Amino acid sequence: MSSLLTKTRMLNKILQKSGTEPVAFQDICTLLSEVLECNVYIISKKGKVLGYTFGKDFECEAMKKKVIEDKKFPEDYNKTLLEVNETLSNLPNEGRCVFQEIGKCKKVDKLSTIVPIIGSRERLGTLILARFGNPFTDEDLVIVEYSATIVGMEMLRAMQDEITEDTRKKAVVQLAIGTLSYSELEAVEHIFDELNGNEGLLVASKIADKVGITRSVIVNALRKFESAGVIESRSLGMKGTYIRILNEKLIDELKKIK
């Protein structure tokens, strides 16, 4: 078995990436599974599986279905996980499956370790490890808790990136709307009311007649939105124009104007 220092160095290699490149949760799961010889799962606060690696020769169809197919742990089990506020190590399964609806477990020597993932004093998720017959040592737990800290930092980073991207998308839409004339703005409001979703077919002449504007006003408005990357459009000849919204903030921002 590798020493604590060797294991830590292996984990640190994951972090030796550029400052802008996020650490993949799957990479952490894979490495932990290799160095600790166990199953590893990273679960979000809502129970979504963000990363996982099964240990060598692991056989459990129930677990594989939850993780691989559903990509989500049952709500009742996740609720139990969220009640854990500090590391719980080497929990025996005592012949019971962690999923209540399944009941008995064929393996009677399974040991689980549950580690809360916390960032900025907020519960972000859970790191779960499972091994058969061989308890997790204090040395193992040092590695596991260090890993949970890394995962917490990456979750916070991902959340910040999501907020930044959300802000950027709103700004792009607001700039695009700001380039429209009054009649063009009136046109796009009717266009996206008619669209009834994120994509669809538009007949410009019908909307022009309905609103009382020229067809060129509609065409100019669509061109401005397309050049801003907010929508994409494609002429289908006599059938009309196919429109697809690329920036999901568009509809929300248009609603604010009404």
From Swiss-Prot:
Gene3D superfamilies: 3.30.450.40, Winged helix-like DNA-binding domain superfamily/Winged helix DNA-binding domain
UniProt key word Nucleus: no
Pfam families tied to this protein: CodY, HTH_CodY
SUPFAM superfamilies: Winged helix' DNA-binding domain
Domain of life: Bacteria
Region (GAF domain): 1-156
InterPro entries: CodY, GAF-like_dom_sf, GTP_trans_reg_CodY_C, Transc_reg_CodY_N, WH-like_DNA-bd_sf, WH_DNA-bd_sf
Name of this protein: Global transcriptional regulator CodY
